[in-house]
Amino acid sequence: MTVQIPKLLFLHGFLQNGKVFSEKSSGIRKLLKKANVQCDYIDAPVLLEKKDLPFEMDDEKWQATLDADVNRAWFYHSEISHELDISEGLKSVVDHIKANGPYDGIVGFSQGAALSSIITNKISELVPDHPQFKVSVVISGYSFTEPDPEHPGELRITEKFRDSFAVKPDMKTKMIFIYGASDQAVPSVRSKYLYDIYLKAQNGNKEKVLAYEHPGGHMVPNKKDIIRPIVEQITSSLQEASE
C-alpha cells in the first residue's frame, strides 16, 4: 500500500513569483518538509508592465524586477473592486490543479491569498470531483469590498464577487489566517474582515477558523515561535482528515 504524501499549493503575492515566495516562506516550508508535506509553488500568469503598478518605481528598480521575473500578478490591481478581473489568474490555478492535483490544501499570500480564499470556497465547482481542501492558509489576505450604502461607514463584499466569497455551510476546510499588526499594504482590519466572514459561516467555531497575528508588516513570518503552532495546525488538519 502506497502512502500518499500530503500536497499543498502555494500562491505568491503581487510582484513575486513562486521561487521568491518559496524563499519568503522558507520557515514554514522547511517545517512542512520535515513533516513530509509536499509544497508546490507556481507562477502567476499576468505579466505586469510598469504602467500597471499602483505606485511609482524608478527605471533601475523596474529593470531589476523584470530581470528577476517578478513582474507577476494573479490579476491587475484596481482600487475599484468591481473593475477587478480575476479570470486569467483563476484559470491558471484551476488548470494546474487539474493537471497536478488533487491538493490537500492551499496557501496564499496577499493577492494570492485573496485568490486562494475564492478557490477554497469554489473548489468543487471549479474542479469537479476535487474534494474540499483539508486546510487553507490565508496570509495577509483580503476580500473585494465596497462601501455599504445601507450602512454608512461600513463595507460589504462587492456584488460582482459576492458568490466568490460566499462560504458554504457544509465547508469542512480548516481556515488559518495570518496577518501582521504593522502591515501597511494590507492593514490587519482587512484580513480580520475576511476572517470574520468564515468565522460567522462556521457559527463562531474557532477550532475550524483560526487567526494568528504577528508583530511584523506585509510578510510571511519566519520566527519559530510564531510559525511552529501554525505548522502544527496545518499538519494536524492533514492527519485528521486522512484518518
Swiss-Prot record:
Keyword flag Nucleus: yes
Assigned keywords, A-Z: Cytoplasm, Hydrolase, Nucleus, Serine esterase
Main localization, broad class: cytoplasm
InterPro entries: AB_hydrolase_fold (IPR029058), FSH-like_dom (IPR005645), LovG (IPR050593)
GO cellular component, one term: nucleus
Catalytic residue list: S110 (charge relay system), D183 (charge relay system), H218 (charge relay system)
GO terms for biological process, alphabetical: apoptotic process
Subcellular compartments: Cytoplasm; Nucleus
Disulfide cysteine pairs (residue numbers): none
Domain of life: Eukaryota
General function of this protein: Serine hydrolase of unknown specificity.
Other comments on record: Present with 14600 molecules/cell in log phase SD medium.
PANTHER family to which the protein is assigned, alphabetical: ESTERASE OVCA2, FAMILY OF SERINE HYDROLASES 1
Family statement drawn from the similarity comment of this UniProt entry: Belongs to the AB hydrolase 3 family.
Name the UniProt record assigns to this protein: Family of serine hydrolases 1
Underlying gene: FSH1
